C-alpha cells in the first residue's frame, strides 16, 4: 500500500508495533479510514479502497480482532510521535474521558450495563448496555484551528 509522503513519519513510528503482514494491512486500513466518508467500519474502508487492498476482507477484520499486537505499545508509540512532532515544547496537557458505547445483541463479548451520565439526571438513572471506554488524549494546538484538539492515544 502506498502511503502519502506526509504520512511516512507516523507510519514509521507505528511500524515496529506490528508484524510485517499485519502492518501492511494496518497501513491500508489507515489510508482507507482517512478516505472513507460515513461510518468507518472495516467493510466501508475496504469498499473505499476496492482493489488497492489485496487479499480477503476477513484478513483485514482480523487486524482488529485476532492479530498479535499490543494496544498499549501502539498507544505509547503514538504518544511518543505526538510529543516529538506536535508538542515539542512547553507543558503537555492530558485529558481523560469515559463513554458508553452501546452494543445490542446476544453475541457481543464483554458487554455490561453501565450508567449513562449524559442521559441520567439526579432523580432518574439511564442505563445502557455495551462497553465503557476510557480514553486518554493529548491536547494539541494546530495553527489552522481556533481551539485545541484532543488526540486520543490510549
Model-derived features: where do they sit?
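Conserved, well-structured functional cores that handle cations and Mg-NTP chemistry
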Residues: 1-154
Amino acid at each position: 500500500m502506498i502511503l502519502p509522503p506526509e504520512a511516512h513519519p507516523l507510519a514509521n513510528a507505528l511500524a515496529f508495533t506490528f508484524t510485517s503482514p499485519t502492518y501492511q494491512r494496518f497501513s491500508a486500513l489507515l489510508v482507507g479510514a482517512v478516505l472513507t466518508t460515513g461510518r468507518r467500519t472495516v467493510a466501508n474502508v475496504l469498499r473505499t479502497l476496492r482493489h488497492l487492498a489485496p487479499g480477503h476482507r476477513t484478513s483485514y477484520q482480523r487486524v482488529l480482532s485476532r492479530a498479535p499486537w499490543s494496544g498499549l505499545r501502539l498507544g505509547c508509540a503514538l504518544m511518543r510521535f505526538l510529543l516529538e512532532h506536535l508538542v515539542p515544547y512547553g507543558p503537555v496537557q492530558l485529558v481523560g474521558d469515559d463513554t458508553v458505547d452501546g452494543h445490542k445483541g446476544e453475541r457481543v463479548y464483554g458487554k455490561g450495563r453501565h450508567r449513562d451520565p449524559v442521559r441520567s439526571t439526579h432523580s432518574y438513572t439511564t442505563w445502557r448496555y455495551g462497553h465503557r471506554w476510557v480514553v486518554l488524549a493529548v491536547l494539541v494546538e494546530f495553527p489552522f484551528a481556533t481551539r485545541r484538539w484532543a488526540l486520543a492515544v490510549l
